[in-house]
Amino acid sequence: MTVHIHPYVDNGVKQGSGHFAGGTLVCKCHDRPVKVAVKGDVAHNHACGCTKCWKPSGATFSVIAVVPRQNVTVLENGDKLKIVDPSAVIQRYACTGCGTHMYGRIENTGHPFYGLDFIHPELFQEQGSAAPAFAAFVSSVIESGVKPEQMGEIRARLKELGLEPYDCLSPALMDAIATHVAKAKAA
């Protein structure tokens, strides 16, 4: 039995073009879709198992990446965007029509990822953004209904796809968080 991770990666991870200049994210609405422009390529693209990230129907994981917040602009139908959970660290702006999360923003200037917006690269109209490179918060899929006994198969499938599974973020991102905290303590 094939383990389904996310439609964006289930048939193999497609490598990015290496020169993606950005594009337009489009929600799933047929009438007045929300459109968001993103300048430049994405960074830290990964499969995420947390229960906060938006997942398309049938997906076990989301696919999420970051871009500088100044590179994100709502182009059309921004009146349809609403923050999903105002108490969350990442303010996820979702379309009120279809529920698609268009971008997530951190407003806390003391947060290690302040200045980066979280986006779902599979929503790009254009092809070629950087490919997912790892899987984060893998065990968290249990919280969304995956049976614990399926985790071995899920981790094996992630590895087969070239997405190293972590139960937190990747080592590079965890190092960035620890560095930020250490600098803040030293200040």
From Swiss-Prot:
Keyword Ligase among UniProt keywords: no
GO MF annotation: an example: S-(hydroxymethyl)glutathione synthase activity
Pathway(s) of this molecule: One-carbon metabolism; formaldehyde degradation; formate from formaldehyde (glutathione route): step 1/3
Pfam families, A to Z: GFA
Family: Belongs to the Gfa family.
Top EC class, one word: lyase
Cofactor: Zn(2+)
HAMAP family: Formald_GSH
Matching NCBIfam families: formald_GSH, PRK05417.1
Residues given in the record as Zn(2+) 1 binding sites: C27, C29, C95, C98
Domain CENP-V/GFA: 20-167
Superkingdom to which the source organism belongs: Bacteria
Catalytic activity annotation: S-(hydroxymethyl)glutathione = glutathione + formaldehyde
The EC number(s) this enzyme carries: 4.4.1.22
Gene3D superfamilies: glutathione-dependent formaldehyde- activating enzyme (gfa) (3.90.1590.10)
Keyword Membrane on entry: no
Descriptive protein name: Glutathione-dependent formaldehyde-activating enzyme
Cofactor note: Binds 2 Zn(2+) ions per subunit.
